[in-house]
């Protein structure tokens, strides 16, 4: 292979070869003891720490290229690795290694009147293809979660993170080899050739599931072109609604965190809805706190009247995942008005209410049809790690199979085991 070209195999042939190796590895992983899978993750964590200088050097190449290409500050932040972020990756691996293994768990058990014993147990999905963009940490998170859930994975990261992904991938191979597991259990597409994405999406019968992690255009392409099942992680067009009975002290603290803690993650609040019954002076204080934190406010004419710094909001803004220090703001008449706005514009990821009225909060929690609905908490808690699931492979916003943070359990299916003593089914 030279540069970004595939010299000896077509993209379809290359992907088929990787998938066949992954299938063989998945059969071994499906039977691997929990301790062996956990050992591979702990050894990978150790490798990340030992090779941190090499990983950061590789990442510096990607960051320099992104900056030379005048990529957005949000994109560069998602791409950039630091010693602290590497340590977080290593620590996450150790957390996942100690999570309960879902493989083999009994979901349901029953005995039929004829004596048949039926058991429904969790099993790995098989071979999972993961397509993602600028975040290098997905290489480790995705590999760890697929491995611990007994699946083999084929990773196709974004071209902007190619050097970072290759460096991180080597630590995973080292962990697998030292633990005595097949290195083909986790494979990284080694080229930036976009044709490999198409080959993955059409590898029906070879790849069991594709998970896209990235922006709207990536997810849309995957959903349109895929000939294999897709578990989609869509935009995080998240709302925080300040009810008229909200505690102003909580509001300011939570809303600033929900927007500004890390603006480039999918759990960041993108739209702020404020009840008209909430005190105007507290609204001014909240907006000023956001400005002080470096946030650009885009508001309706009413918002601009009380906040001269605010820019005019457009219709397009309400449906935009900024992933940046920008927030759309408007007043709503009451909770029903807030619910109507959320139903129209939310991507079904995470929406939150701030109020001291439990009855109102419970109605909001029951009414909003999003994967995650919160009360008096920052939307930035929309994360598998914060849910106690370890790392996550994404936030699924669909309604079939997994929903919300997808961790180990979300990467399994199930099968029925039937134990008999010679029963036959009577002729009807």
UniProtKB/Swiss-Prot annotation:
GO biological process: L-proline biosynthetic process
Listed PROSITE patterns: PROA (PS01223)
Biological pathway: Amino-acid biosynthesis; L-proline biosynthesis; L-glutamate 5-semialdehyde from L-glutamate: step 2/2
Enzyme Commission identifier(s): 1.2.1.41
Location of this chain's protein in the cell: Cytoplasm
Cellular component aspect of the GO annotation: cytoplasm
GO molecular function: glutamate-5-semialdehyde dehydrogenase activity; NADP binding
Key words of the record: Amino-acid biosynthesis, Cytoplasm, NADP, Oxidoreductase, Proline biosynthesis
Principal location: cytoplasm
This protein's record includes keyword Flavoprotein: no
Catalysed reactions, as listed in the record: L-glutamate 5-semialdehyde + phosphate + NADP(+) = L-glutamyl 5-phosphate + NADPH + H(+)
Gene3D superfamilies per record: Aldehyde Dehydrogenase, Chain A, domain 1 (3.40.605.10), Aldehyde Dehydrogenase, Chain A, domain 2 (3.40.309.10)
Matches recorded under InterPro entries: Ald_DH/histidinol_DH, Ald_DH_C, Ald_DH_N, Aldehyde_DH_dom, G-glutamylP_reductase_CS, Glu-5-SA_DH, GPR_dom
Similarity comment: family membership: Belongs to the gamma-glutamyl phosphate reductase family.
Protein name as annotated: Gamma-glutamyl phosphate reductase
